[in-house]
C-alpha cells in the first residue's frame, strides 16, 4: 500500500480553477433578483387580465409597458438557467470532452431560444 504524504495544497495545485466562481455566483444572484421582480409583474398582469379575452391579452402584451418586462423575464430566465446548468455540468461531469460539449450545447440552446423569442415578439406577419 502506498501513501501520499504530500500536503493537500500540493495535491490540489494545477487541477484547474474556474477563476470566475465569484463572478458566476454574483450573476446568478442578480438574475434571481430580476426574476423575482418579473414574477411580481407577471402575477399582477395575470390577475389584472384573468377574465380577459385572448385578443385583449395579446393586445396588452404588445404594449411596451408589458412587452419590456416580458422580454426581460424570458431572457433573464434563460440566462439564469444557462448559468445554473453550466455549474451543474462543471461539477458533476468528469469527462472533459463531454463536459465542454454539454456546456456549448446549453449555451447554444439558450442563445437560439432567446433569438427565436425576440424574433417571434417583433415579427409583424
Swiss-Prot record:
Periplasmic domain ranges by topology: 46-67
Record bears the keyword Chloroplast: no
Membrane topology according to the record: Multi-pass membrane protein
One GO MF term attached to the UniProt entry: heme binding
SUPFAM superfamilies: Fumarate reductase respiratory complex transmembrane subunits
Example GO BP: cytochrome complex assembly
Keyword Transmembrane helix: yes
Pathway given in the UniProt record: Carbohydrate metabolism; tricarboxylic acid cycle
Cofactor: heme
Subunit (UniProt): Part of an enzyme complex containing four subunits: a flavoprotein, an iron-sulfur protein, plus two membrane-anchoring proteins, SdhC and SdhD.
Official protein name in the record: Succinate dehydrogenase hydrophobic membrane anchor subunit
Gene this protein is translated from: sdhD
